[in-house]
Amino acid sequence: MGSLLFSWKGTQQKDVTIKSDAPDTLLLEKHADYIASYGSKKDDYEYCMSEYLRMSGVYWGLTVMDLMGQLHRMNREEILVFIKSCQHECGGISASIGHDPHLLYTLSAVQILTLYDSVHVINVDKVVAYVQSLQKEDGSFAGDIWGEIDTRFSFCAVATLALLGKLDAINVEKAIEFVLSCMNFDGGFGCRPGSESHAGQIYCCTGFLAITSQLHQVNSDLLGWWLCERQLPSGGLNGRPEKLPDVCYSWWVLASLKIIGRLHWIDREKLRSFILACQDEETGGFADRPGDMVDPFHTLFGIAGLSLLGEEQIKPVSPVFCMPEEVLQRVNVQPELVS
């Protein structure tokens, strides 16, 4: 597999070539085995070096196992004890024991506990107070006490509170104003007002607007066109112009299109072929691109992307929360999407 510049309608684009012998069927059992064994290898270099994002790693692994109907293979009690140990006095939750709390890992922990129907393991009132404390006067959210502002954190805040049934704990109107101020002329969203549109930020902002019932504020046709332009001749999707395709954008772009009701605008079969080509036939798991090293992050978003494409072997996934739809139905959290 190599990258190349591909001429498409007169414009050169970065893309990848997919070999003729690339996998074209879903290797579900291998992926389940890969994830089940990943967390057990606690002395591996890769495992040790990912401690700084452990909570999100647990979320990726559990969610993809649940989507594949394999959640029972994970160590529930060990995970619940770990999450409880990561909650700080301020209410926030950290990536790992001894690390600083952050909104990203607080959301991951709440998603995990929602999967397991075990939110009672943590002090919910303190989590709510922590999220409240990070909202600024303009409605934006910092990720932690150090103050970085990003629309990702706006999404983390409302997603966390929605799962806990506490969305009214923040100033929702001001939060909406801030996110809308990050909308660009091309229909997309950036991390702050005036920042470049990016598929990851668009997912966070459309997800935020779905949770807060504000999708009518989005120009779905304009944004849908920008998102569809992310598809390359290989079938893969990139996050912004002039970038290579990456399996994770099979989630960020595809989920955004689903939220705004424009999923049918892309070539679904070519995208499906690209995602399947990113599997490792020997070890299981998905990589960012065909032939690269696999990891739990891309494995979740490859499987979740296939779910949005209607893969029958995978449970239906929520495009807003990246969790099984059945879990969101159980907790009665069902954001309204554009039809």
UniProtKB/Swiss-Prot annotation:
The enzymatic reaction requires the aid of a Rab escort protein (also called component A), such as CHM. Binds 1 zinc ion per subunit. CDD domains: GGTase-II. Ubiquitous. Detected in all the major organs in adult animals. Geranylgeranyl diphosphate binds at H198, A199, G200, R240, P241, E242, K243, Y249, S250, W251, W252. Gene3D superfamilies: 1.50.10.20. InterPro entries: PGGT1B-like, Prenyltrans, Ptb1, Terpenoid_cyclase/PrenylTrfase. GO terms for molecular function: Rab geranylgeranyltransferase activity; small GTPase binding; zinc ion binding. It catalyses: geranylgeranyl diphosphate + L-cysteinyl-[protein] = S-geranylgeranyl-L-cysteinyl-[protein] + diphosphate. It is an enzyme of class 2 (transferase). The modification Phosphothreonine is found at T11. One of its GO terms (biological process) is protein geranylgeranylation. It comes from the Eukaryota. Keywords: Metal-binding, Phosphoprotein, Prenyltransferase, Repeat, Transferase, Zinc. PFTB repeats lie at residues 28-69, 76-117, 124-165, 172-213, 220-261, 268-310. Its EC number is 2.5.1.60. GO terms for cellular component: Rab-protein geranylgeranyltransferase complex. Zn(2+) binds at D246, C248, H298. Induction: Increased dramatically by cycloheximide (CHX) treatment within a short time (as early as 2 hours). Actinomycin D was used to determine the half-life, CHX treatment resulted in a dramatic increase of the half-life from 8 hours to greater than 12 hours. Its cofactor is Zn(2+). Catalyzes the transfer of a geranylgeranyl moiety from geranylgeranyl diphosphate to both cysteines of Rab proteins with the C-terminal sequence -XXCC, -XCXC and -CCXX, such as RAB1A, RAB3A, RAB5A and RAB7A. Belongs to the protein prenyltransferase subunit beta family. Heterotrimer composed of RABGGTA, RABGGTB and CHM; within this trimer, RABGGTA and RABGGTB form the catalytic component B, while CHM (component A) mediates peptide substrate binding. The Rab GGTase dimer (RGGT) interacts with CHM (component A) prior to Rab protein binding; the association is stabilized by geranylgeranyl pyrophosphate (GGpp). The CHM:RGGT:Rab complex is destabilized by GGpp. Interaction of RABGGTB with prenylated PTP4A2 precludes its association with RABGGTA and inhibits enzyme activity. Interacts with CHODL. This is Geranylgeranyl transferase type-2 subunit beta.
